């Protein structure tokens, strides 16, 4: 999602370089957000560019360049925050480039849940192992048992979206891992850029293809949710490029994102 948000900013930058009217850029910004309505990081970054542009295509172009640079730096800085704060061993699941970078910098033993059905965790495990990290891969179903009997310094996961309530939308299995960590008295941290904090508390469930779970001939229903919602009270903190966000910090970031989104109301009023 971070990569898609950067691509959206590139589109906005390139269009701003060749058009001279604000209304066209408003339409571009609307289309970019409509194409990924559940992607908070994309909306937040586009809104930040538009909110400070004062209806100027030149300003949109320049601000988009600045925002791209900041976005490219944000994940690396968040990973550094996590590496500085945590101590191993670490448990995680699925794939996150920011989690990977944090774990490479931390260089502690890692247990990775494979993240069925597509097993994105294998990609993370292999990337860490190829860099010399001591890695154990296990099934999602085994994670609770592993956490109950082995010593871990923390659970570290990424995030698709963080709601203003502090609840975390991430790969299915994150909620179960967090519950298992709570039972084992292991703190759970999320590492992500602060732009993944959503301006509103809407959760958009997404289902994957049924054939990822079952491709037989029996007449049965398949539940294949791509993301789950982990309650914020199971999360010790959110580690970002600006340090650790507690619940109050998350609320303040969400409020700023809501403020940045108000450019659209002003644009609509002006156009009428």
Predicted feature residues:
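Gly/Ser/Thr-rich loops at beta-strand to alpha-helix junctions
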Residues: 2, 93-99, 117
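Nucleotide/pyrophosphate-binding catalytic subdomain
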Residues: 61-65, 69, 76, 122-125, ...
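Glycine/charged-rich beta-loop-alpha catalytic/anionic-binding loops adjacent to active sites
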Residues: 27, 62-63, 109, 155-163
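A short, well-structured juxtamembrane/interface segment
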Residues: 70-87
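Histidine-anchored nucleotide/phosphate-binding helix
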Residues: 96-107, 178
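Long amphipathic alpha-helical segments
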Residues: 1-69
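Conserved phosphate- and dinucleotide-binding cores of soluble alpha/beta proteins
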Residues: 115-272
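Residues that mark the start of a beta-strand
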Residues: 88-89, 109
């Amino acid at each position: 999602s971070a990569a898609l948000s950067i691509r959206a900013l590139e589109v906005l930058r390139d269009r701003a370089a060749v058009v001279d009217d604000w209304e066209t850029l408003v339409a571009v910004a609307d289309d970019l957000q409509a194409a990924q309505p559940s992607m908070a990081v994309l909306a937040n970054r586009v809104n930040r560019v538009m909110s400070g542009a004062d209806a100027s295509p030149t300003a949109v172009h320049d601000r988009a360049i600045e925002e791209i640079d900041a976005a490219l730096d944000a994940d690396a800085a968040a990973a550094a925050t996590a590496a500085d704060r945590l101590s191993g061993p670490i448990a995680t699941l699925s794939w996150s480039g920011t989690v990977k970078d944090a774990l490479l910098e931390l260089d502690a033993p890692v247990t990775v849940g494979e993240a069925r059905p597509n097993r994105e965790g294998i990609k993370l495990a292999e990337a860490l192992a190829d860099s010399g990290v001591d890695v154990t891969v296990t099934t999602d179903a085994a994670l609770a048992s592993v956490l109950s009997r082995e010593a871990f310094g923390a659970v570290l996961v990424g995030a698709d979206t963080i709601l203003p309530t502090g609840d975390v939308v991430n790969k299915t299995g994150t909620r179960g891992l967090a519950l298992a960590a709570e039972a084992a008295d292991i703190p759970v941290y999320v590492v992500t850029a602060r732009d993944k904090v959503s301006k509103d508390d809407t959760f958009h469930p997404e289902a994957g293809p049924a054939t990822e779970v079952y491709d037989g001939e029996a007449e049965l229903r398949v539940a294949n949710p791509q993301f789950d919602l982990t309650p914020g009270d199971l999360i010790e903190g959110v580690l970002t490029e600006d340090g650790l966000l507690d619940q109050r910090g998350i609320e303040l970031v969400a409020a700023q994102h809501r403020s940045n989104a108000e450019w659209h109301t002003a644009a609509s009023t002006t156009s009428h």
